[in-house]
């Protein structure tokens, strides 16, 4: 009986399952190993070489930027100090904004002039531009006369009229009216009336253009136009156009001074100006 159980039933059989040849034997080749990856995180010994020259350049640029920043801060603080000193002294720093393509003056009727006075101010501004147009056309007319043999002197005088007339009108009567509208100053209104009357007289004189005290045909008025149209029709037409422009400027100026004077009287500025003039005379006397 014991002989039947001498063999262990759990022993592995010496049977090769691949001996039949249906399954090919495994190859002895191995898969190639993975390439070695650098230890970005664990390799603490890795170093990065930074050129010393680039480090020096960066430090130099940083110092230059800090110096420029300090200079800008210094200029800003100095500008702020000047603005504060000017505001304490009552000086208003105005930004130049007109004409838009080349700002040379500060001019902002819509934001600085009261609404009920803006129409009068725009009319006065049109009068200033009209004077500039008249004097510019006067240069064109005298240039044509000079080409036709009238002499260079009348052309030079026309240039002088334009160079002195337009800035003079702005300083003497337009800017005082602008400030008077802003501040309601009676004395500035009086300054405007004085020089605007001179402006009106000049426009009327230019429309007539007698030969005295101005030189010959240096103004494109009616008398020179009649004189030159017989010799040269084109020059005569230029002078007649100048006469028409000076007439329109004179009419517009009369309308402007009439409206400003009506407002001046109606708002009580006339009596205020008299009181201010009286106080000024008393201060001068004492």
From Swiss-Prot:
The chain crosses the membrane at residues 127-147, 152-172, 189-209, 237-257. The keyword 4Fe-4S does not apply. GO terms for cellular component: plasma membrane; recycling endosome membrane; trans-Golgi network membrane; transport vesicle membrane. Pfam families: SCAMP. Residues 1-63 are annotated as: Disordered. Keywords: Cell membrane, Coiled coil, Cytoplasmic vesicle, Membrane, Transmembrane, Transmembrane helix, Transport. Residues 1-10, 54-63 have a biased composition (Basic and acidic residues). It is a multi-pass membrane protein. It comes from the Eukaryota. Its main location: membrane. It is found in: Cell membrane; Cytoplasmic vesicle, Secretory vesicle membrane. Residues 52-89 form a coiled coil. Residues 1-126, 258-286 are cytoplasmic. Probably involved in membrane trafficking. Belongs to the SCAMP family. This is Secretory carrier-associated membrane protein 2. It comes from Oryza sativa subsp. japonica. The lineage of its organism: Eukaryota, Viridiplantae, Streptophyta, Embryophyta, Tracheophyta. The gene is SCAMP2.
